[in-house]
Amino acid sequence: MLRTYQPKKRHRKKVHGFRKRMSTKAGRNVLKRRRLKGRHRLTA
């Protein structure tokens, strides 16, 4: 079986990071929802 998840720190940050979230309206909404929900970790 192939291992499909090959983690890379850079890719994870580039795709799911805080700055990426802040760069779009939808991303800011994601952060807002996670803050309202009380998440300790907002982004990857």
UniProtKB/Swiss-Prot annotation:
Residues 1-23, 30-44 have a biased composition (Basic residues). It comes from Caldanaerobacter subterraneus subsp. tengcongensis (strain DSM 15242 / JCM 11007 / NBRC 100824 / MB4) (Thermoanaerobacter tengcongensis). This is Large ribosomal subunit protein bL34. InterPro entries: Ribosomal_bL34. Belongs to the bacterial ribosomal protein bL34 family. GO terms for biological process: translation. Residues 1-44 are annotated as: Disordered. It holds the Pfam family Ribosomal_L34. Keywords: Ribonucleoprotein, Ribosomal protein. Transmembrane segments: none annotated. GO terms for cellular component: ribonucleoprotein complex; ribosome. PANTHER family: LARGE RIBOSOMAL SUBUNIT PROTEIN BL34M, MITOCHONDRIAL RIBOSOMAL PROTEIN 34 FAMILY MEMBER. The gene is rpmH. GO terms for molecular function: structural constituent of ribosome.
